[in-house]
């Protein structure tokens, strides 16, 4: 389970979805469920980005929140549907997504996505950022 904090709000990926706490972790509320699992949660400028997995449709969704995790907007309409989206990060004004088709970039907060680097056969990239450097770690079949 990954935990991130922004402006006093804690967010975490859990086996039931994405959970939120506004009192230092004493109480938690489920904020994204979709009948699935919380895969990842990341800090982005002004909020959070989350990846969830729906066990019924077998797809992963990518969403952002800019109000402390109260509401979430989908940003994955331009990404090919898949059960294996591994990560989403922000560097500067750009979002990057580790996807089975490769690494995608969005320069408009997820409205559109462009393939930057095609995938390696049977791999999906987990992305990590340090400053302005993006590290892409290939993994078999996603997370």
Predicted regions and their residues:
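Extracellular glycan-interacting surfaces
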Residues: 1-143
């Amino acid at each position: 389970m990954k935990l991130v904090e922004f402006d006093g709000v804690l967010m975490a990926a859990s086996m039931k979805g994405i959970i939120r706490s506004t009192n230092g972790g004493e109480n938690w509320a489920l904020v994204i469920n979709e009948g699935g699992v919380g895969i990842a949660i990341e800090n982005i400028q002004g909020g959070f980005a989350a990846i969830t997995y729906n066990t019924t449709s077998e797809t992963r969704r990518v969403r952002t929140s800019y109000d402390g995790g109260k509401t979430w907007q989908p940003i994955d309409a331009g990404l090919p549907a898949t059960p294996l989206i591994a990560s989403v990060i922000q560097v500067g004004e750009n979002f990057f997504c580790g996807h089975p088709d490769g690494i995608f970039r969005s320069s408009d907060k997820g409205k559109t996505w462009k393939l930057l680097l095609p995938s390696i056969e049977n791999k999906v990239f987990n992305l990590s950022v340090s400053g302005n450097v993006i590290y892409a770690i290939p993994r078999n079949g996603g997370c």
